[in-house]
């Protein structure tokens, strides 16, 4: 079974409760629990890493000899981060899920380390505000930082990480939708998953990477191998070209002779436009945030960032007013280099911003004059030892956008039992995307854990 882009399952669907719940779908339609697929991949990485390190010395290496760093998209939520730790544990990388031998590093943070430490150290100085635009295959992740010092390097997060599922595979999906429309459902179904299909994708990848959106640019596709899966000869290919062009504006007409199909610039650009529009809108919203202030540098990293079309869009949106867009010399390697730096220098990020509001359900005295209390009164009220009716409330410990202490410890809050005879207190830990939450309503909060004291 061949699984592609399975990492995106954790980005595309939320609300999972169990680690075994997400499913990965293979090219042939077969389904397996995502944890099985992810564990197999991480186990392979582990075995390859140990074999390589062992080959460099006369001593056989084990997992205990290695400090592991697993890079993840910045848009992964708490569930997804826990999922990756469980997968690493099942793969034998760590002995316990919470082992300190494994660190999770956000991909744009790794890139930020690489850019400020090695690729562009001359650009960063104390007070400099930078944005990392990490454009990969599946996701686009954006983090924003202020340089506090250079020796030692210390960075402060300005805004919570943001981004979305707008990687280069979205452009690939648009191209594959065109293939389906062009060839027809029957021919496309016969082609999908074959070696000829991946040969076509390789041709597309070559053209996509270099495409800059110029009016005279074209992408040429050799359909010889494709033709073998649908008895498509030169005459049939001409019919397919004519059928597609019918109803299309002239600038989107495909051309070519025999089994060659040439995609015009306007058509290729239409594959990019929705994805780049999503990225630009996110960049615009981030830069306009009043909490961020003046931006000096934007570092472009990730494989998709090498796209001339994407680079031009980022520069059009961000450059000016003292801001410069800097593309990494080796955009696909920046995250790997940064992860290696992160392994020994995780404390470089002195302050991070909370992406969610976290708190617990506690109790307050019911007030019949408060309409919010009346609205939330239950059919089976709870009373304290003094006979006072109690109602659930939300007690926040940290709010979205607030600084997370470097040691992860929030200010202490005190709670007392509703009944003096209680021997334990049960807390339900909730999170919310909103800042000001007073009550644990289901449409405003969601559960993340439980604690019994």
Map each language-model feature to its residues:
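Gly/charged contiguous loops adjacent to phosphate- or pyrophosphate-bearing nucleotide/cofactor binding elements
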Residues: 10, 33, 73-75, 166-315, ...
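Gly/Thr-rich phosphate-binding beta-strand-loop-beta motif of the actin/hexokinase/Hsp70
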Residues: 117-157, 175, 358, 370
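Conserved helicase motor "Helicase C" RecA-like lobe of SF1/SF2 P-loop NTPases
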Residues: 82-87, 305-322
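Acidic low-complexity intrinsically disordered segments
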Residues: 232-274, 279, 349-453
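Conserved phosphate-binding/catalytic loops in two-lobed NTP-binding clefts
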Residues: 92-106, 110, 314-338
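Early-domain small/polar-rich strand-loop-helix modules and first-structured segments
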Residues: 1-21, 97, 103, 154-155, ...
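Phosphate/ATP-binding catalytic cores across multiple sugar-kinase/actin-like superfamilies
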Residues: 40-59, 110-121, 126, 253, ...
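Nucleotide/phosphate-binding catalytic cleft detector across ATP-hydrolyzing
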Residues: 3-132, 195, 199, 213-214, ...
């Amino acid at each position: 079974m061949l699984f592609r882009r399975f990492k995106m399952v954790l980005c595309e669907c939320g609300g999972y409760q169990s680690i075994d719940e997400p499913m990965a779908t293979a090219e042939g339609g077969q389904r397996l629990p995502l944890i099985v697929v992810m564990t197999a991949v991480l186990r392979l990485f582990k075995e390859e890493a140990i074999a390589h390190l062992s080959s460099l010395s006369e001593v056989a290496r084990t997992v205990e000899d290695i400090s592991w760093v697993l890079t993840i998209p910045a848009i992964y939520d708490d569930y997804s981060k826990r999922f990756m730790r469980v997968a690493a544990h099942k793969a034998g990388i760590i002995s316990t899920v919470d082992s300190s031998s494994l660190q999770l590093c956000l991909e744009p943070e790794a890139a930020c380390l690489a850019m400020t430490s090695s690729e562009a150290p001359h650009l960063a100085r104390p007070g400099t505000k930078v944005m990392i635009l990490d454009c990969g295959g599946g996701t686009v992740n954006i983090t924003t930082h202020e340089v506090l010092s250079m020796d030692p390097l210390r960075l402060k997060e300005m805004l919570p990480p943001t981004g979305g599922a707008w990687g280069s595979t979205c452009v690939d999906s648009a191209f594959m939708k065109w293939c389906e429309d062009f060839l027809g459902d029957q021919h496309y179904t016969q082609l999908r998953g074959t070696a000829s299909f991946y040969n076509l994708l390789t041709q597309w990848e070559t053209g996509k990477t270099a495409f800059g959106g110029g009016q005279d640019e074209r992408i040429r596709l050799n359909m010889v191998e494709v033709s073998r899966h649908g008895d498509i000869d030169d005459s049939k290919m001409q019919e397919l070209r004519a059928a597609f062009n019918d109803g299309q504006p002239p600038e989107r007409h495909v051309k070519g002779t025999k089994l060659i199909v040439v995609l015009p610039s306007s058509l290729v650009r239409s594959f990019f436009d929705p994805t780049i529009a999503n990225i630009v809108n996110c960049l615009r919203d981030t830069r306009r945030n009043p909490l961020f202030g003046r931006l000096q540098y934007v570092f472009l990293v990730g494989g998709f960032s090498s796209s001339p079309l994407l680079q031009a869009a980022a520069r059009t949106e961000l450059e000016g007013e003292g801001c410069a867009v800097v593309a990494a010399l080796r955009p696909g390697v920046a995250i790997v280099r940064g992860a290696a730096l992160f392994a020994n220098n995780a404390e470089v990020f002195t302050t991070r911003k909370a992406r969610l509001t976290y708190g617990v359900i506690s109790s307050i005295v019911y007030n019949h004059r408060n309409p919010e209390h009346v609205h939330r009164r239950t059919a089976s009220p709870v009373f304290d030892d003094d006979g006072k009716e109690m109602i659930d409330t939300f007690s926040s410990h940290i709010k979205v956008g607030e600084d997370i202490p470097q040691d992860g410890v929030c200010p202490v809050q005190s709670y007392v039992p509703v009944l003096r005879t209680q021997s334990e207190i049960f807390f339900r830990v909730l999170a919310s995307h909103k800042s000001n939450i007073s009550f644990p309503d289901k449409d405003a909060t969601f559960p993340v854990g439980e604690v019994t004291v």
